[in-house]
């Protein structure tokens, strides 16, 4: 048993979408969350910068004595995860890409057309395609597209109005039609926040979310190391490098609590 907190981090607010699934599945666990809202989005940055930012956050998490680290950001999972594991070889580390690809392999038939929506950095890394084909080498119909406007809009709280709907149609109408997509994979944790809008615009399409699947990965890793928490009085803490109104609103909405009930703090990483 290990009652230390789990360190979860993201380039912004998207990683918050993982936390309700974690708390439902593992109610005794508590988290330290860090959202790098001052430097978001990561998806358009160089790999060198993404790795440097990843280690900035990881060093902060290590200083808080977390028992494992979760890169709840697909861009970090695609580009920075190996650097994180190299820096902290004794620390359990997971990202969000592999759990999502496990679900793709479980849910999708060999003839289905899979569409991966992600940031430019994640698409360029080919991480999703490679991970899916490790699991299912015969999958031939895997397509991916970058949607760079989504994260900035979501960070501003724009998730279901006409601006977001037009952005979705701009990126996805031709992509879905031309590639005969059957299943969308939300390859960015931010995109969970527009899932309902996607379902409204494209009814009948299957959707797999990287946000939903990571709780299972966390459970498996901690269980295998006998590190699951028991009943305790710990408290989750939420940090952001820019404590915006939207960050606070997102936490309260996702967790169903008032701001006064939550431990929300500002943390600069020497930006």
Regions found by a protein language model. Give the residues of each.
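Non-catalytic structural scaffold of enzyme domains
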Residues: 1-271
